[in-house]
Amino acid sequence: MLKREMNIADYDAELWQAMEQEKVRQEEHIELIASENYTSPRVMQAQGSQLTNKYAEGYPGKRYYGGCEYVDVVEQLAIDRAKELFGADYANVQPHSGSQANFAVYTALLQPGDTVLGMNLAQGGHLTHGSPVNFSGKLYNIIPYGIDESGKIDYDDMAKQAQEHKPKMIIGGFSAYSGIVDWAKMREIADSIGAYLFVDMAHVAGLIAAGVYPNPVPHAHVVTTTTHKTLAGPRGGLILAKGGSEELYKKLNSAVFPSAQGGPLMHVIAAKAVALKEAMEPEFKVYQQQVAKNAKAMVEVFLNRGYKVVSGGTENHLFLLDLVDKNLTGKEADAALGRANITVNKNSVPNDPKSPFVTSGIRIGSPAVTRRGFKEAEVKELAGWMCDVLDNINDEAVIERVKGKVLDICARFPVYA
């Protein structure tokens, strides 16, 4: 018999210590990785529920196992909320991750060897949009598009590449692009050659849900997203579509199960349902508006301190600092800021002379600090501290002084009060 009072601390001290240390790290470090965020206790409650015990291969009302009457309710809630939130008429909430969701879309719509037009990873794209080290780059003939000299997506080049190579699919979406994407223009280019438009909106899903960033769902044939990042839910994936055929939706469902996955993670799907409900609340819109304001406020400080920001600004939650002119590598900047309890990630910049393991830039995002309650005043102060560290990257006294300020502001703005 399993006793409810069982706990990790009394059973596995070594593991518990690591978990507790991570909890402290999250409270005492400022998180600026653009893809990270903090889930609500409600989301974590769902993930730690008894739903983790239930196998439920199939879809609501069409399961391969008995005893699914309640998990059917859970999954249908998640499906209905996803459709309502993003204005879709199809949703699949089962993908275990954004990459799994993307894989399912490729499986449903393409054959190995088909030509695909995707954003260059070095200019803001994502691994699953055609990187040669990823399944997408191994299975398909990838033609990259990129950005122009101003740092904006080059739609003329995209249209030219589309006409020349006649891809079966064009991918919209990014992991390190700070501008507004013209989804309608992308659909126009796709329609001109009879291609699918597939949008991966993982990074901006929360902003889109709140009406702060344009929604691709009315324009794309298929859309995927993660449920964490700006959406602030559990780690997982989601597929959406609007105006498609039942045949398309059946292909997408089959590409998730049974093609790519077996049993869905019902505890995670419950957590997705919670997060989607939270994203419908008025305070979520206020939060996302502040995310965008905070990113702009940080950019202003970096520019005033003489740092180069790729594309000159941001229209979403993230931006890239180009450190080439400062003779700094992303790896060095990442490490120095980390010693000051400020977490970022090194990131390649356009025409980067360094390898992806070193890079010449860092990516900065505002979702997590905004979740803590930071507003413009706090993020401007934070950006100034970051400049102090980068200006004095080998001065441990400066780094320690900034670390003290970070610990103080983290205590004033706890993640979980």
Curated annotation (Swiss-Prot):
Residues binding (6S)-5,6,7,8-tetrahydrofolate: 121, 125-127, 355-357
GO molecular function, one term: pyridoxal phosphate binding
Family per record: Belongs to the SHMT family.
Catalyzed reactions per annotation: (6R)-5,10-methylene-5,6,7,8-tetrahydrofolate + glycine + H2O = (6S)-5,6,7,8-tetrahydrofolate + L-serine
Assigned GO CC terms: cytosol
Function: Catalyzes the reversible interconversion of serine and glycine with tetrahydrofolate (THF) serving as the one-carbon carrier. This reaction serves as the major source of one-carbon groups required for the biosynthesis of purines, thymidylate, methionine, and other important biomolecules. Also exhibits THF-independent aldolase activity toward beta-hydroxyamino acids, producing glycine and aldehydes, via a retro-aldol mechanism.
Name of the coding gene: glyA
Site label Plays an important role in substrate specificity, positions: 228
Protein name, UniProt field: Serine hydroxymethyltransferase
Cofactor(s) needed for function: pyridoxal 5'-phosphate
Domain of life per record: Bacteria
